[in-house]
């Protein structure tokens, strides 16, 4: 399959008509299939001064019909899980479609499946006998979903003049005005990793604070060490997600391991976990809730989570300092008590059993 040009949505490309890209052959591992792929990097010039890059290979992007950078539907800009669920409810799911959540946890199996899929795409001819009615129905459903979730931002971007300073300014304002207060109120950012006895049916965790370039298989491989995973939902752009275990026993084993890794002396804050010795992740018990969907909400939530990560680090440092101070104070009190006891013993006077007398 050709790697001359990536599959990128309009939102990731930015408002400019011409963009400069850097191409690196076999630059990184695909986040889905773990195979090396050609990475593209560019600056979208959308007012954020943050460069973008492709994070999945062309084969996985084509199988999911998604953008190689943001992993949203490349046509309608909606999350893949919502898209697939809507099409499934309407009875329009494709039989050969690879689901966005890969059930295999083995790296070699993922790579083999991707190789087969790539060979299939290279050999297949365009199917001209697809049902036009079903395609039209699917497009209608996805268009309505896009309007509801994104506020019809795709249409606004297409109509807006390119290379316009007003467009860039409006994009920044949209990010600032994105309301995520209701979503934040449901997220256990101040939770704990201590096993809750009051909710024995709970077997899910809220993960947050990880880097947006962490491969999802690193998280899934670590979680699978403790038992079978029911679902793993990660939103890289928002730096958060949920993992749900099939059994409570597996969930408790997962929590206990994090508590005993030597990084969580303060049990009042979410547990800290370091994956692959370079990806810090905070973990807390929490029932799975809907996460953000639009680009503006994801960006704003990622900023909030970054701030929360700094606050949690400061709390852990204060807790550690207080613990050291208390220990030193107790040691000093113990030393003073021993010294006082020693001085008391040295000042004791001789007391004769009988009255002294002078010869």
UniProtKB/Swiss-Prot annotation:
GO molecular function: pre-mRNA binding; U6 snRNA binding
Entry protein name: Pre-mRNA-splicing factor SLT11
Family classification: Belongs to the SLT11 family.
Amino-acid biosynthesis keyword on record: no
Family annotation (Gene3D superfamilies): 3.30.70.330
Pfam families given in the database record: STL11_N
Key words of the record: mRNA processing, mRNA splicing, Nucleus, RNA-binding, Spliceosome
InterPro entries with a match to the protein in the record: Cwc2/Slt11 (IPR039171), Nucleotide-bd_a/b_plait_sf (IPR012677), RBD_domain_sf (IPR035979), Slt11_RRM (IPR034356), STL11/RBM22-like_N (IPR048995)
Main location: nucleus
Region (Disordered): 324-359
Subunit structure as annotated in this protein's UniProt entry: Associated with the spliceosome.
